[in-house]
């Protein structure tokens, strides 16, 4: 690992810690999870549908929001800030490649995403003892696709104003697709091939879930598409050279 790459990872960590707005978005999902639990407890949902189904429902609602808010939005804001302040040109002159830049942008979001993948089931009381492998695989793949999706959006933003305008729709899109999939069978058939389709299908019935499916292949296609577009934007905008 080169010193430039280590320095960029360290710098992004410092930017995250120094920006209170980003820190708030990173930790806000924990508050929202407890808020969801409180609201459902007031409605007596646990007694009506059972504790296990309630935990699964909370997991389905909480995880997309947690990943989109704590991982996605900070990516967009940080990239837009770097572009607005012309930090990218300085990195280019320092010899940082597009690959190094994109990879350094993935490290901290991946760490934060893994944190929420681990802690969310514990907070909602979901029992995953027999589903640890499939849960980990589905969520890690989904997280990686989301990171590249928000990275693509962030590279598209020219300034922080544009980032604020696009981050909310992007976050809501990622968060609400699983909810829309559960609203009707027709929507489910369409959205099953979206970049949140594998997650939605898994959360509907993880006990009978099969990884090698159309949803899995669609997710791989989305991953390649978002990653390819991210590198294309780097080249097209002439931010960094390979």
Task: State where each predicted segment sits.
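Alpha-helical transmembrane segments and their short interhelical loops
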Residues: 98-99, 106-158
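Junction motif at the cytosolic side of a transmembrane helix
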Residues: 89, 220-242
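A structural motif at transmembrane helix-loop-helix junctions in multipass membrane proteins
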Residues: 20, 140-177
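Terminal transmembrane helical anchor/hairpin motif
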Residues: 178-224, 228
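Aromatic- and glycine-rich beta-strand/loop motifs that create alpha-glucan
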Residues: 1-28
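Hydrophobic alpha-helical transmembrane segments of multi-pass membrane transport proteins
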Residues: 54-93, 97-121
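Membrane-interface helix termini and inter-helical loops of multi-pass transporters
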Residues: 41-53, 124-129, 203-205
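Hydrophobic alpha-helical transmembrane segments of multi-pass membrane transport/permease proteins
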Residues: 18-43, 58-74, 166-178, 218-227
